Amino acid sequence: SDGAPVYVKWQVIWAAAFTTGVFCISAGLCADRYFGYLERIKALVEARGLGVYTDSTGEHINRIMGSAVVQALVGPEFKTSKLGQAKAINFIARLPDWISPETKRGAISLVGGLYGLSLGERCVYSMITLNIVVFGLWRVPRLLPTMARHFLHQPHSGKAYTMLTSMFSHATPVHLFFNMLSLWGTGILVTDVVPEEHFIAMYLSAGVISCLAMHIQSALYPAFAIGYLGASGGVYGLMGVVTVLYARNGKLSESFPLTSATMPILLLVSMASDCVGIAFKWRGVGYVAHLTGGILGVAYAEWYSGVWDKLVLSFMARHAKKDVAE
């Protein structure tokens, strides 16, 4: 109830455990992927050295793309080097005849666009899609009680996991649009220079800790003990990371107009406005979450990003030891 005290201890423990866990799991997955690449390269080199190398993947793709059904739809000029894309095209080509060829070709173009994305871009777009899906679920009247229980962080509830799930909820279409626009802009830049697993760990951790900061504010000032939602804490964390990367490397992307001089100014102006909102105790906007996310992003990218490399290397070393033991 609104008159109940807002407890903090469990939320702090949960946020610390989540941040540690998401970084360890993400680093482990990244190490698995890197080690898989190394194993494939090793096998390829060994096969070529023995003179037994065959491009089985290429042959599989040629068989799929050379089938009469696929050729009738895409023509002989269509080429792909991706097995997953070839399988998707084959599936589309074999859909029922009542689906027009134009519709099938449109679906194939969409598949081509998806496979043309980098792993980082797919990760960012997947995160945006998840936010849109959750926003849609909020619009289903019969789901409102469930969404309010599990996708809105309410300080009086005593729940901690909603500090994570509330990141994917948004109050209005405008709220969703601007947060997703910012997530797209910063996410694409970040995933250009760090693995997508690292991006996920940074984004989710910044969002959870930013929500924790709002939770602590509500414990100190009961007037702020209202429901929290939104991705802005995580987005501000990415903005902080991008600011440091800009300061180090200059322009990260030719298509992105900000420079190493203007990016820090943009973040400082945003954070200064958040400080004003906090000082005047304005409500309705998560100023504390914004400020916390920005500070976390800058601090992490400037001083603690080496922790990620150490985690990944430690997991890769375990892989190597396991291989030697076997």
Predicted segments — roles?
Residues 2-326:
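A detector for small-residue-rich transmembrane helices and their helix-helix packing motifs
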